[in-house]
Amino acid sequence: PPAIGDEGQAIGTYQHADYMINKQIHKSNVYAGIEYDNLMDVWPYKYEKADYKEIAQEIANGKIVGWFQGKSESGNRALGNRSILADPRNPDIKDIINHTIKMREDFRPFAPAVLEEHYKEYFDTRLPSPYMSRICKVKSDKVPGITHVDNTARIQTVNKKFNKKFYNIINEFYKITGIPMLLNTSFNCREPIVESPKHAINTFKRTELDILVINDKVIIK
């Protein structure tokens, strides 16, 4: 489940009761936040149309990206709509993000978002983990940026059906680097995960994020 906690218990209890009483089955949808229209119309910033190949190349070159797409996620995990994305091959990327963007403790790890068809090549687990709820051993030394000190990672597996845009940006990075994953952490700086375009832009401005992608628009510092 995407919301592991009291809020998830409440939602699950409601769905169970609805099924028992009305035989109503609710389809899972982790992206249950607000849909924002005309996102950039009120912002006097220069922006370009998003090109996934170019964004993936920038990540491969060491840039760190704020990634804002559609509706926000339910629960406390960033699952590809309110994320900070970076190159998992960089052994220093954890320190860079912790010290210049997240402003948090050094010991806290970062998660990989990996293409579902490739997760078994890099992680010792038999089951996919679409909600970033599974911790497993890392089998490769090619991705130190997402490997914790005990050689584990809390993985998110991504397929096209789950989140097409997120899948596509990871896939473009894979085509460039041969690594089918990105470092994925929540889009925030010592506060709740960003919800609105205004919140995303303010966080972008006051941190060392290099690029901000809001749906199909790109802002570069």
Language-model features, listed with the residues they occupy:
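Flexible beta->alpha loop and helix N-cap segments adjacent to enzyme active/binding sites
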Residues: P1-K221
